[in-house]
């Protein structure tokens, strides 16, 4: 194997994101690791004679971004799916037209998936029915995935293939929407969409595993172009774990991928009594493919997250959960005893309390260094932040979703609920919580620049302010996309900051994300992306 040459990055504005937020002028990379961070003189004095020299002409260098909560295995199949994005599609007729046009070229009987549909963003403000989908996809089982990924809309062929009919009982954790006669309308909520999601995903993958690996690799290259050098897939099933194993074995993983393992389907009950489930979670890791963590969903998006509202001084509960409080407690405690790290999804304040109660029990019996993650906290009470901080919980937040979904979350919260805050990142930081920013892609953009901008600007797609008192600074946003998610992913000692001994996961940017104007932050461009000292992406002309 050819020995890697040392790399000197000089004439730079190096934002190390270390404990002191210190800056430097140069970095020496040797053997894929950061060797020296300091002045150009110090770096030149320690570099090998044949070292490569990269003069960045005053550009900013930061650690690679880490997206700790993403759904890469879902997003990878976008090129083979029907793009039903709303916007730019503005009416249901436009959505149906693009579906029909796509399906004309698909062999009969082959599954087709539609993506990025959001009913609240079209004129009709409704979902398509099975019969409308039958008309535009008459020869194929078709499944349109809601942009939230918590619902889907199927045609008759798809429903028939997975055995959903008038007499199908309601599944655990989900709902089959029915007409007055009891016949399914095609709308499937939460776990009811499991069979459709799994059947269509499995068909896409198993039809051609080699192509599936190439699609995954291509999506990872897209991520490199926006500066991602580490990603966590926040719902890995047995089949998507197989896809990752194949990609890793083929040398098609250009950065670290952490698997947060779920059940057999996207939303399905975790069963730690099954040896195959535990074996999958605890499967030996490779350098780039990591495991050892489990994802648990607590509350649902439909009818709404689990929220305790206050009306006339009395508490009212709205929303629904997948698990009861005792079930979450037992799952978390058992997982901890097995040595499994945890990432638990809690969107509303009631669900968050259930998660915190479970984590308090885990902390009583486990090592204080165990990483315990709360995913989302979309609608929370500011007082919950202090409890998170006391328990040492990592909050993985998604303020980028406020851009497209802000009005929906406001509706879910309810009127005159002053005790509830939307995406309360500022409050959580002030309480001492370690907060990471993450995309939840494909539910929202995967661009760290856009998500950091949303956290700083607190604006929706319509340009409306969304609780601007919860805004963070650009400096804080940078930490929340680098060192904090490194810790949440169990790799804080490996990466996330530019310090001697850490992996040389580095970005060269076209502007300083800390000092640029807020409006410019979302326009930030990555010029170069290095993973372990290897140049994995270079912007043309940079």
From Swiss-Prot:
<feature type="propeptide">
    <location>
        <begin position="1"/>
        <end position="2"/>
    </location>
</feature>
<protein>
    <recommendedName>
        <fullName>N-substituted formamide deformylase</fullName>
        <ecNumber>3.5.1.91</ecNumber>
    </recommendedName>
</protein>
<comment type="subunit">
    <text>Homodimer.</text>
</comment>
<comment type="similarity">
    <text>Belongs to the metallo-dependent hydrolases superfamily.</text>
</comment>
<dbReference type="InterPro" id="IPR033932">
    <property type="entry name" value="YtcJ-like"/>
</dbReference>
<dbReference type="InterPro" id="IPR032466">
    <property type="entry name" value="Metal_Hydrolase"/>
</dbReference>
<dbReference type="Pfam" id="PF07969">
    <property type="entry name" value="Amidohydro_3"/>
</dbReference>
<keyword id="KW-0378">Hydrolase</keyword>
<dbReference type="InterPro" id="IPR013108">
    <property type="entry name" value="Amidohydro_3"/>
</dbReference>
<comment type="function">
    <text>Hydrolyzes N-substituted formamides, but not amides. N-benzylformamide is the preferred substrate, while N-butylformamide is hydrolyzed at a much lower rate. Has very low activity towards allylformamide, N-(2-cyclohex-1-enylethyl)formamide and N-(alpha-methylbenzyl)formamide.</text>
</comment>
<dbReference type="GO" id="GO:0033966">
    <property type="term" value="F:N-substituted formamide deformylase activity"/>
</dbReference>
<dbReference type="InterPro" id="IPR011059">
    <property type="entry name" value="Metal-dep_hydrolase_composite"/>
</dbReference>
């Amino acid at each position: 194997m050819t020995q890697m040459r040392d790399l000197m990055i000089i004439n730079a504005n190096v934002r190390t994101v270390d404990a002191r937020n210190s800056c430097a002028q140069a970095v020496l990379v040797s053997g894929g690791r950061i060797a020296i961070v300091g002045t150009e003189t110090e770096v030149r004095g320690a570099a090998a004679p044949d070292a490569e020299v990269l003069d960045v002409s005053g550009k900013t260098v930061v650690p690679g971004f880490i997206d700790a909560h993403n759904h890469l295995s879902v997003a990878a199949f976008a090129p083979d799916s029907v793009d039903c994005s709303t916007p730019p599609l503005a009416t249901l007729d436009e959505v149906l037209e693009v579906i029909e046009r796509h399906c004309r070229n698909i062999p009969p009987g082959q599954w087709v998936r539609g993506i990025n549909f959001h009913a609240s963003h079209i004129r009709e403000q409704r979902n398509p029915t099975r019969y409308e989908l039958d008309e535009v996809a008459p020869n194929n089982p078709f499944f349109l995935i809601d942009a939230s990924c918590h619902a889907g809309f199927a045609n008759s062929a798809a429903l028939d293939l997975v055995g959903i009919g008038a007499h199908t009982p309601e599944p655990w954790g989900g709902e089959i929407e029915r007409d007055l006669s009891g016949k399914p309308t095609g709308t499937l909520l939460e776990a009811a969409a499991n069979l459709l999601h799994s059947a269509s995903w499995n068909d896409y993958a198993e039809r051609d595993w080699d192509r599936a690996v190439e699609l995954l690799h291509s999506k990872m290259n897209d991520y490199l172009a926006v500066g991602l050098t580490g990603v966590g897939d926040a719902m890995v099933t047995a089949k998507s774990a197989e896809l990752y194993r194949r990609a890793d074995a083929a040398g098609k993983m250009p950065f670290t991928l952490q698997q947060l393992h779920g059940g057999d389907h996207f939303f399905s009950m975790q069963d730690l009594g099954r040896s195959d489930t535990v074996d999958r979670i605890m499967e030996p890791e490779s350098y780039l493919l990591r495991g050892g963590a489990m994802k648990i969903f607590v509350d649902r998006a439909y009818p709404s997250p689990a929220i305790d509202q206050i009306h006339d001084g009395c508490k009212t509960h709205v929303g629904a959960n997948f698990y009861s409080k005792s079930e979450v407690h037992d799952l978390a405690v058992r997982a901890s005893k097995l040595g499994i790290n945890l990432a638990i999804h809690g969107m509303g304040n009631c669900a968050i309390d259930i998660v915190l109660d479970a984590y308090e029990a885990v902390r009583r019996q486990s090592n204080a260094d165990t990483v315990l993650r709360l995913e989302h906290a979309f609608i929370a009470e500011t007082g919950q932040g202090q409890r998170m901080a006391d328990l040492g919980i990592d909050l993985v937040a998604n303020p980028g979703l406020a851009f497209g979904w802000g009005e929906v979350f406001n509706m879910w919260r309810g009127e005159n609920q002053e005790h509830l805050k939307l995406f309360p990142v500022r409050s959580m930081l002030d309480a001492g919580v370690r907060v990471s920013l993450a995309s939840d892609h494909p539910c929202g953009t995967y661009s760290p620049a856009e998500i950091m901008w949303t956290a700083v600007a607190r604006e929706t797609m319509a340009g409306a302010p969304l609780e601007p008192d919860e805004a963070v600074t650009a400096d804080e946003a940078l930490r929340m996309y680098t060192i904090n998610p490194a810790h949440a992913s169990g790799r804080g000692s490996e990466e996330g900051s530019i310090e001697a001994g850490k992996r040389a996961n580095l970005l060269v940017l076209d502007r300083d994300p800390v000092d640029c104007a807020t409006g410019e932050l979302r326009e930030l461009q990555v010029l170069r992306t290095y993973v372990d000292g290897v140049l994995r992406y270079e912007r043309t002309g940079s």
